[in-house]
Amino acid sequence: MPVVIRLARAGTKKRPVYHVVVADSRYPRDGRFIERLGYFNPLMPKDNADRLKIDLDKVKAWLAKGAQPSDRVARFLDAAGVKKRTARNNPEKAVPRKERKAQAEAAAKS
């Protein structure tokens, strides 16, 4: 059972609130979950302490059991100092394709 720590949307239309939950990755985003670990309210100011509340002890326990955090939850855990987030680095992204290289070389010759 692949377990993930992710955000489940709650709240009303145009006023989202997210629950930080542990769920099987095959469950729907807002569906069944195993345990609720906290909440995130994106409408609150960034400096407000109630914007994000997570039970870090429970998170550490689930990480020890093998649960994988989603990208957004990994950012939260990195900010809290629980788990270091690996930087996404794709050095091949800026390399032009072969056709573009050929066009650039042809343009440079003329």
UniProtKB/Swiss-Prot annotation:
SUPFAM superfamilies, per the entry: Ribosomal protein S16
One record GO biological process: translation
S-S pairs: none
Molecular function GO labels: structural constituent of ribosome
Ranges for region Disordered: 84-110
UniProt biased composition (Basic and acidic residues): 90-103
Protein family per UniProt: Belongs to the bacterial ribosomal protein bS16 family.
Name of the protein in its database record: Small ribosomal subunit protein bS16
Gene that encodes it: rpsP
